[in-house]
Amino acid sequence: PSYAKSAKTLPLSKETVDGSPATGSSLAVANSKGYSIDQRYSPAGTIITEIKTGQILWDENSTVEWTPASMSKLMTIALTYDAIKEGKLSINTVVPVKERHARVSANSNLSNNKMQVGASYTVGELMELIAVPSSAAATYMLMDLLAPDIDTFVTMMNNKAKELGMVNTKYVNPIGVLNVLLGQDGPSGDPYADNYTSARDYACLCTYLVTNYPDLLNHTINANLVSKPGTIYEERFEGHNYSLPGEKYAFPGADGIKTGSARKGYNYSLTAKQGNTRMIEIVLGVSVWGDSSAESMRHLIGNSILEDAFAKYEYRKVLSAGKYSVKGKIIEVKEDFYDCVPKDYKPKFICDFKNKKLKLNISNRQYLNGFAEPSASFELIKTVA
């Protein structure tokens, strides 16, 4: 009887609410907000996910194969953070510039900073050079810390992609260009091969990075960079992620991650946090290389769909730990239950006594690889007569 008195009634529902991701045209969403963006800027693929659950909130051709371009360099950053976690190096490890790095930095086919033999950079400084000017030479300097040669490193990249469930991704080099453009510093194999991926796969990678290595945000939050200030190696760079703080299309709560542009168009990845809710956004394939307006258009489009996602969804507690009365039984939920839900949603639950699990009455939700629908475990305390 005392259990029954202290237990709250758990709101149940046999009917489910549709939780399918929003779909459609991101360009149309942007234009519905008052922009007049030409059809040629329609992205090849976009996705928005909530980071804690991996739930897909917006999906526009998210599995279409596309080149990540310079966003390829995020995988080098991921492997570097893995090595830091394993104790092989630290964010403050000093890396000297070698002749090869200076040669790569002089390759006019690549985004770069000027690397000079005699200079040295910490791992953290190299990450910032990758994040803002998208330095190929900085990428090579990190690669050379982690692998004996580029072919071995590319294998490491692909193994990590497989581990993260990036099923539509293949890397052929760490830079994100045709192999032939890397000259003598390129890998073996097809000289005209390029990396390919999908928006969904890059959401997996960005989710992994931001979740496991939030220090990354310290290196990607700034759109602009002064490298080696006050030294003979000082360089100043203006970045291209216009959704970051202080930029012309700054998005509320944005604090990383990276852009990438290639012959097939303009891409970017972004993470933003509002309240307790953090989202990941990937935009791939806006217009084509050389279209000077495309860098702006990708952010107007991306910001528009991200604004809608934050307006609709939040990550919040949907059930407190405690005792509940369910169908003549008393159950105890040991931990608070959190989920990503529409802001106007009033939680109702489906109770699985066989597996001792509670989940929300929301159907058709989709998740990134490696994630599953959230649930809460419970113990059966008593059957009330």
Q: PLM features: residue spans?
A:
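Active-site-adjacent loops and short helices of periplasmic peptidoglycan-processing enzymes
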Residues: 3-200, 210
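Gram-positive cell-envelope targeting signals
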Residues: 1-4, 385
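Domain-terminus/edge residues, biased toward the C-terminal soluble/receptor-binding domains
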Residues: 190-385
